[in-house]
Amino acid sequence: MSDPQTSMAATAAVSPSDYLQPAASTTQDSQPSPLALLAATCSKIGPPAVEAAVTPPAPPQPTPRKLVPIKPAPLPLSPGKNSFGILSSKGNILQIQGSQLSASYPGGQLVFAIQNPTMINKGTRSNANIQYQAVPQIQASNSQTIQVQPNLTNQIQIIPGTNQAIITPSPSSHKPVPIKPAPIQKSSTTTTPVQSGANVVKLTGGGGNVTLTLPVNNLVNASDTGAPTQLLTESPPTPLSKTNKKARKKSLPASQPPVAVAEQVETVLIETTADNIIQAGNNLLIVQSPGGGQPAVVQQVQVVPPKAEQQQVVQIPQQALRVVQAASATLPTVPQKPSQNFQIQAAEPTPTQVYIRTPSGEVQTVLVQDSPPATAAATSNTTCSSPASRAPHLSGTSKKHSAAILRKERPLPKIAPAGSIISLNAAQLAAAAQAMQTININGVQVQGVPVTITNTGGQQQLTVQNVSGNNLTISGLSPTQIQLQMEQALAGETQPGEKRRRMACTCPNCKDGEKRSGEQGKKKHVCHIPDCGKTFRKTSLLRAHVRLHTGERPFVCNWFFCGKRFTRSDELQRHARTHTGDKRFECAQCQKRFMRSDHLTKHYKTHLVTKNL
């Protein structure tokens, strides 16, 4: 396609050895190209004369011919301004009148439909490295431009001056694919009948959040009021907005009779599938047991009646909801949450007998007995495994113990195991007769431990006996040692104005205070444990020896992951060298080092044996 004012270049081929001369398609004759003139000039110039005598005669050259420019026939112009002329490769002229353009194409646009576009590639020079690529544009009805990569072997694009893409794709490419919209999820309605025997409401929906809408008047027993089948509507959860919060409570249409109970509708959001609903007055306890080893969760939903100004009364009967069967027979421990409230009933009280010995020598017996909680409505925000607080009741031989019923519990200080003695003042001794004692030993609570309280001159002592509770055994003193300590405490009573002397040793030889000046070199500290009779020169050695009888090991290794206990401090120091690798004992002959002195002594004997040999 060409305008009459535009020139088209045509190339004529005469022979393989001839030159190519372009010819213009206009009505006037065009001049030869500079390439043709240069070729003709070079052919006319002969070889130099000097070289002609030396060189052999050249072969006969073909006589050059002057190429005549090939001029196409002039295009006859029509009177119309929109006429187009097309020159084909065979020299034929195709002329299209402007009237055809104006009649068929209002915008002056011309579209050529080429039936066989593969004819373009059937030229004489098939190996030419020329490639054309066109990316058409499809203008949609909603003013959106779509870029399409065409297949160059099956389609041709012609773009007029209006920049609108007209494309003729092949039937095998660019097939339209219909896009279907996503299906709209419809709310499913499930009808669950209410059992007449036990008021059980079950949710048949799947996993996820399920919104359960129950009118209040349908929660009563079906056998009593003859209520119809309850309709449960399941709907997908939606985020709470201002309109949703106001729609939590809505009334029924006005066509129904104005019943105050039926107009109030409560919406309960349940997050699991296995639900246990427990009715407790106006509180709904929902026990969720998801299973799979996960702990159950208790949620409390409280039905709040409307304000007095709305003149609506909400009443839920006591038999409205009962316990729904759980997914498993035994529920796991309910974790603690701030909003969870549940009641704990105390077990039957077990009396505990406590003996108190007064300074006058009388022994009083006090029975410590647990009592149930003061108020039945009291709730505890703790887990089910934790013990509840209990108020003690006491009954004793004296009248002053009867006034201790209303007093609060006063726990005693922690008592160390293995017969350690803890000093108590008068206030703590009075509290011991007023409350049940709870002793914490290594994080384990032992209740109802029988104790023996002895009285000295202004100083009270508490000694732990051998007792077993909650699979915990407290290793205390033997009955002989306990009796001996009681005798020592009674014998140590002094007058108020007398000065007491500190006694480092309580063995029989040191207790009487007799000084044996003539036997200073002898061992005077005797072990008072029966059938032992060992004597020691120092009280520290005697105390360390007594720990062997009692089993007490107060020295603990604080090294990581060790925790070994020892009776004596030197044993602990010797053990610590195994961790640090300290070898302080060195052999004087071979400079070999050892951790313990006895090992060095044993090693030194090897040198003596070698020397004697």
UniProtKB/Swiss-Prot annotation:
This is Transcription factor Sp2. The gene is SP2. Belongs to the Sp1 C2H2-type zinc-finger protein family. One of its GO terms (biological process) is negative regulation of transcription by RNA polymerase II. A zinc finger (C2H2-type) spans 525-549, 555-579, 585-607. Pfam families: zf-C2H2. The modification Phosphoserine is found at S78. Residues 23-32, 225-235 have a biased composition (Polar residues). SUPFAM superfamilies: beta-beta-alpha zinc fingers. Keywords: Activator, DNA-binding, Metal-binding, Nucleus, Phosphoprotein, Repeat, Transcription, Transcription regulation, Zinc, Zinc-finger. GO terms for molecular function: DNA-binding transcription factor activity, RNA polymerase II-specific; DNA-binding transcription repressor activity, RNA polymerase II-specific; histone deacetylase binding; RNA polymerase II cis-regulatory region sequence-specific DNA binding; sequence-specific double-stranded DNA binding; zinc ion binding. GO terms for cellular component: chromatin; nucleoplasm. The 9aaTAD motif is a transactivation domain present in a large number of yeast and animal transcription factors. In SP2, the motif is inactive. Residues 1-32, 225-258, 372-404 are annotated as: Disordered. A motif (9aaTAD) lies at residues 361-369. The keyword Zinc-finger applies. It is found in: Nucleus. Residues 372-389 have a biased composition (Low complexity). Binds to GC box promoters elements and selectively activates mRNA synthesis from genes that contain functional recognition sites. The keyword Repeat applies. Coiled coil: none annotated.
